[in-house]
């Protein structure tokens, strides 16, 4: 299996942890994996994105334009910003959520419905994940990363076994947050 995955969002959404969980799950399955993260001003609400490349013959962790199989978007505006990296037949799974990154707020912001419409018009395969009800059910919005990871896994878009992802969660999430994160991961089963 060869898979190129980009995760994108804003600081504080758990994008980096989700990237590390995907990489750990791939390694548990014996697959070669390389990843790179750009976190910039993440702690201040800036843009965050991760590139993950799984499979043989990968020489660099960076994914070229038009080469991503999957774009996992934690925030609509950032998802649109990373869309040029998606293959023509690639898949987008994005949270139906807009969080104004600091960089966007400096320029006056954007309309989330316009971002959603743009994705609908330009992505060959698009799944918009409605996360607000899940936040209410689970009692926390801090599990966005595991909700999206679970939705991507349930759809088969990651190409990894759910058991490998669950094992990666158990190995990488602190014990006091483990139960909530596993519930979030399994929410869309």
Please describe what each predicted stretch is.
Residues 1-189:
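Active-site cofactor/cluster-binding pocket
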């Amino acid at each position: 299996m060869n898979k190129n995955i980009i995760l994108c969002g804003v600081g504080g959404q758990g994008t980096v942890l989700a990237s590390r969980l995907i990489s750990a799950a791939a390694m548990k399955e014996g697959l070669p994996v390389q990843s790179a993260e750009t976190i910039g001003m993440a702690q201040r609400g800036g843009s965050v994105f991760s590139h993950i490349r799984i499979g043989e013959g990968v020489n660099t962790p960076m994914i070229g334009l038009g080469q991503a199989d999957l774009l996992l978007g934690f925030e609509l505006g950032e998802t649109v910003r990373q869309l040029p990296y998606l293959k023509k037949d690639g898949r987008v799974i994005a949270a139906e959520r807009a969080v104004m990154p600091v960089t966007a707020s400096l320029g006056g912001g954007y309309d989330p419905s316009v971002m959603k419409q743009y994705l609908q018009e330009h992505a060959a395969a698009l799944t918009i994940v409605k996360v607000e009800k899940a936040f209410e059910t689970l009692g926390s919005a801090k599990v966005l990363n595991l909700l999206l990871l679970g939705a991507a896994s349930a759809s088969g878009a990651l190409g990894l076994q759910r058991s490998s992802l669950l094992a990666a969660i158990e190995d990488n999430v602190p014990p006091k947050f483990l139960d909530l994160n596993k519930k979030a991961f399994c929410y869309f089963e």
